[in-house]
Design a protein with these regions (language model features):
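Tandem repeat scaffolds
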Residues: 1-191
Length: 191
C-alpha cells in the first residue's frame, strides 16, 4: 500500500496503524476490515474509493484528497477533516462512528450522514447545504456559523442548533426536534 499508484485494488485486513503513508494515489480502491488507527496520510489522494468495516480513528489526512469517498460501518473518531485537501472534497457516511471529529470550513453540500454517531462533532463555518442527517445521534455536536439551508434533520436526534448563528432557510426538522432549536432560550416544550 505504499508503492502505488493503485487502481481498482482491493485491500482486505491490512493493518497500517500508526504508520505514515506519503504521496500515494488510490483510485477506485476498496478497503475492507483494515486498521488505519492513528495513521498519517500526507499528500495522498483517494478517488472513488470505498472503506467498509475499517478503523480510521484519529487518522491524520494531512493535505490528502478525499474525492467521492464512501465510508460504511467505519470508526472515524477524532478526525480533523479540515486537514484534508479542499479540492473536490466529497465524502459520504453510513453506519459510522464520527464522534469527536471536526469539519472546520469544509464544503459538504448534499453530504449524506446515514445512521451515524456524531457525538461532539464540530461543524464550524461548514457549508452543509442539502446535507442529510438520517437517524444520526448529534449529542453535543456544535454548529457554529454553518450553512444548513435545505439540510434534513427530520430523523436526527439530540442536536442543538442556534438559529441566530447558522443559516437555516428551508432546513427540515421534525416537531420533536424543535427543542434543539430553542434550547438557548430556556423554553420548556411539551408534546
Amino acid at each position: 500500500m505504499t508503492s502505488g499508484p493503485y487502481d481498482h485494488q482491493v485491500f482486505d485486513k491490512i493493518d497500517l496503524s500508526e504508520q505514515t503513508i506519503l504521496k500515494q494515489e488510490y483510485q477506485n480502491c476498496t478497503f475492507t476490515n483494515c486498521n488505519f488507527s492513528k495513521t498519517v496520510f500526507t499528500n495522498c489522494s483517494f478517488i472513488d474509493c470505498h472503506f467498509k468495516d475499517c478503523n480510521l480513528s484519529v487518522v491524520n489526512f494531512n493535505n490528502t484528497g478525499l474525492k467521492t469517498v464512501t465510508f460504511a460501518n467505519c470508526k472515524l473518531m477524532g478526525i480533523n477533516f479540515s486537514h484534508c485537501n479542499d479540492f473536490l472534497f466529497n465524502v459520504s457516511f453510513k453506519d459510522c462512528q464520527l464522534d469527536y471529529s471536526s469539519f472546520f470550513k469544509k464544503k459538504m453540500q448534499k453530504t449524506p450522514f446515514l445512521q451515524c454517531s456524531m457525538k461532539e462533532v464540530q461543524f464550524e463555518q461548514v457549508d452543509l447545504t442539502q446535507a442529510v442527517f438520517k437517524d444520526c445521534n448529534l449529542m453535543e455536536a456544535s454548529f457554529t456559523n454553518t450553512i444548513l439551508e435545505k439540510a434534513d434533520f427530520r430523523t436526527a436526534s439530540y442536536y442543538t442548533i442556534d438559529p441566530e448563528m447558522n443559516k437555516l432557510k428551508k432546513a427540515k426538522f421534525s416537531q420533536s426536534g424543535l427543542a434543539g432549536l430553542l434550547a438557548k432560550y430556556g423554553i420548556d416544550i411539551e408534546f
